Each structure stands twice: as structure tokens, then as C-alpha cells.
């Protein structure tokens, strides 16, 4: 058995810390709360301009911040939480060997030697207090988290308006928002109101002060989640920490730790103490480990203890499959792929074995009481989601969705934040129906979907089959997309798979923002298009979602530095580049003092005269053309 130390990075050097090309960190201060500093990524262009973009990478891309993974990253929210004076520190539960998948304490202590540096004394709400962002919002309080989010969502829109200053173009491209309320400028008050209404969620456990505030809601930028996690057969703790850092580098707005092997508790400690984004889990996975994988042996008491354990560590949202009811299980019998959710199948098996109602459903208000002590958000799991397009929108799926809507209102009664998980596998023509039903049944609580995959014929390419559905459902109103990697249905993703899945889903989310008409979403596109037209190759690479891949593809055929300033690429070559020809038309127009349209007409007249001078012959000798210079 390898020790805990051997499972961790030998040094901080293993973590990816370099800023992306031509990028540097910039920080914007608050006005209501001047102490806040909102990080963004500034991309410096070769023409002297700067494009500022949303940044999820935390301190890892700021070379001015020293990081020791054994101590964790800076706690940006620590003072905000303390200053509200509604939390208290307490001893917390004692770590049990079963928390880490071991049989006895000696075995566990040997395995996790050296882990104490990351253990924190947990906080909880003082007696009679509620510490959720939803509770504050309903009290009319604009928290530092809310102002932070407002600044972050605006992405220095004042600097990007130069790309959006053509009224005709903006009217033509305004988008279809399907009822979303997209403001020109996000204000802290708007953030507060959206959270108060339950239309948006700020996942922000008081025990995860390292997390930089973000928001999930359809009236904000579409977000992307990345799943990581070890298993009984693959991956070390160190690899999972680096995978989390790697995911945030490429745009993960949240990360779910789905670990199921040994050292689950300790892996989660290391991830949380080093995570600049909210972390989600599926607590039933760890609870199942505690009963040696026998679903029938699960109890409310074991699950409750697991919730408290993870809440004390700082998990920001829990996927809880409380909508898998006993009476819904038979509805899945005629499905092509049955129940494909791990959590859903665990609870279905428990219900059938005991012929009792799902204890997550019967104890739902007890769960609310726990979550509001720490501000853990519900992610109500779709345990009966379709696992194939053949099962999309069936009775089981829709019945569970209605139950999730009922549970949402119970959670809101306790001022606990809620997002709703969605499918799954859904053909394109049925995707909007999913979104419409979710808005209706779940009272506009944010929707969080896995894809959906639009076809089942492409193992190895499911990041694409699902990216299609993700872009569509994001446009229709989904607030957060759970990424799918090329390894979906085939195996656990590695580092490269994580990047591939994230780039695909950031693309889908961005396309959805543009289609919705989100103010400012298209400015980066216009900046890149302008760079492309002006043959600023380095700017094209650096403005893209993956500068490294774009540069590598270009250099496969034109590797020399001189090619980075060439007015052509290897696709068309120097003589057939459409953009070069367009530029020549514009240059000709400028030279002649004409508009582009007039220049084209004048050029046509000149060519017509040349045609007449050559005798109005359709076919002429090449040598004659050469002699006349035409």
C-alpha cells in the first residue's frame, strides 16, 4: 500500500502555474465593499489593445502569489464570513477510518501521514442563525460575494464596448433570450434579487473561504462544471489536485469530486484547500463506501453523518437524489437503458430491497436543517435521467422532475439554495421541451444539465454529441453545463481528456451566451475576427479558448516566425487568401478615394474596358495577355 506522502505531489512544481500566453492577472476593486478584488485575465494584443475575459484559474496563474499546496491557497472570503458575526467555530466530528475507506485507525494514520496541515476547525451557524446567501438576499443584504459576482459577470464591459459599437450590427445579432432577463450592466442589487427569487445560486460554503464567488443562473453567463475523482483502481490524491488546478485553468466554473476509492476524505481536504472554485460532491458515493458497497445497508444515520463530514470540510453543493421515489422505479422497467445514474440506481435498489420510500425524500427537511448551517446548496439529482435517446422525456424522467420541483419549494422554505440536475441523452428536437418543463415544474430554479447527448452512436466522441445538446439547452435557459469528455461511457478521464471536455463545453456555453444575446458576450469574437482579418496571428492564437492548440496547428505547416506576420495561411496560400483579397479591395478604395462598393464597380469598369481593348474575345492567348500586362 502506498503512503499518503507518495500519493501527493513531490513539490508545487507539478502544478500548472504559468499564465496563458500574452495574459496577465488584473484585479478590480469593489465600491460597496472596497476590500474585494475581483480577478480577471487581461489578454494583451499586438496592436496595443487589451481584451479582458472571465477567469476561473484562481491564484495559480498569478506569478506574484506564492502557493504551498500543503497549506492551501489564500482564503479570500475568510474575513467576509467572520465579519457577519453569525458563525462559530467548533470541534467538529472526529475523522473515522471508514471516512477514508480503511478498516482501522492505524491503517488510516499510516496512509494519511502528513495530512494534518490541511485540516481546519470547522464553522457552523450560531444557534438560531441562517448563513445562506439566499437568506441574506431575502433580508435585503448585498454581501461582498454578490458585489464580487456583479463585477466578475460584467468582464470590464466598459473596455469591450468598442467592439460592439455598430448599431446596425447589434440589432441584427441581438439574439433570442427565451424569457431571460439580460441586463446591459449587472449590478450587485440585481445579483441579490436573482438569488432572493431562487433564480440564481451562489455556492459558497462558509468552510470553503478559498473559493472565489461565482453565480449560477440563466440571467448570467452560462457556467461549466468539470468532474474529477479517483476510483478504487486509478489515480492518486496528487493527480486529483493537479486535475482540479488544470480544470480551472481551462475554464471550469465549478468542479465535482466524484472519488470512490480510498482516501476519499483526505483527497477532498486537499482539493478544497487548494480550490478557487466551488466544489460539489455526491455524498451517497462515500456513504456507500462506508457500508462496503452494499446499498441495502445504507441508513439515514450513515448518510446524515456523511453530509456533516463533507459540510465541515467545505463542500459547496451536494447532489442528492431525493426524487427517486419507490413508485417511480417500475416506470423504468421498459426502458432501453434502465437507470443509468449511479446515485439513482443506489437509491432505487435501497427502495426495492426495503420496500420503503427513499430516505433522502422522507428526511428532506432534516437535510435542509444541516445544509443551512453551512450554506451548502442542493443540486437535486436526476437519478432517473434518460441514458439513451430512446428513453428521453419518458414518464419516469418527468415524474422525478415534478418531485424535484416540490422539493425545491421545501428547500426555499428553509432559505437553502437549489439547482436542478437534468439529462442526459435527448435528441435535438426534444431539448427545448426539457427546458420548458423544468422552468414550469421547478419554479425557475437554475437548471444544470449533463449535455445532453443528442445521439448514441459515437463512443469516443461524446464530448461532441453532448456539446451539440449543451449549446442548445444553454441557449434555451440552462444555467450550468456539466462537461462530458471523450472518455464518457469508456473510462475515467485523464488530464488531456479534462482539457478536451472543458474546451468543448466552454465553446458550447459561449455559443449559448451569444445566441441569448448576452451583453458583451460577442466582444471576444469580434476582437478575434478583427485580428484574423488583419493577419495578427499571435492575437488570433491568444484570444482563442486554446491558444496552445491553435498555435501548434498553425506551426505544423508554417513553423517559421516569419509566418506569424504573413498575410496568408497554409489553407489558401498567398494568392488565394479571401481576406487578403478583401483587404486589397479596401486598399484600392482608399487609394482611389472611393467607398468599397464604388471601388468594386470602378474595378469592374476597368476590367470591362480591358476586355474591349482585347477585341471582346472570350478566349484569348495567354501570351497576348502577358504582352499587354493585363
From Swiss-Prot:
Its cofactor is [4Fe-4S] cluster. HAMAP family: ThiC. It comes from the Bacteria. Zn(2+) binds at residues 425, 489. The lineage of its organism: Bacteria, Pseudomonadati, Pseudomonadota, Gammaproteobacteria, Thiotrichales. NCBIfam families: PRK09284.1, PRK13352.1, thiC. This is Phosphomethylpyrimidine synthase. GO terms for cellular component: cytosol. Belongs to the ThiC family. Keywords: 4Fe-4S, Iron, Iron-sulfur, Lyase, Metal-binding, S-adenosyl-L-methionine, Thiamine biosynthesis, Zinc. InterPro entries: ThiC, ThiC-associated_dom, ThiC/Bza_core_dom, ThiC/BzaA/B. One of its GO terms (biological process) is thiamine biosynthetic process. One of its GO terms (molecular function) is 4 iron, 4 sulfur cluster binding. Homodimer. It comes from Hydrogenovibrio crunogenus (strain DSM 25203 / XCL-2) (Thiomicrospira crunogena). It catalyses: 5-amino-1-(5-phospho-beta-D-ribosyl)imidazole + S-adenosyl-L-methionine = 4-amino-2-methyl-5-(phosphooxymethyl)pyrimidine + CO + 5'-deoxyadenosine + formate + L-methionine + 3 H(+). Its EC number is 4.1.99.17.
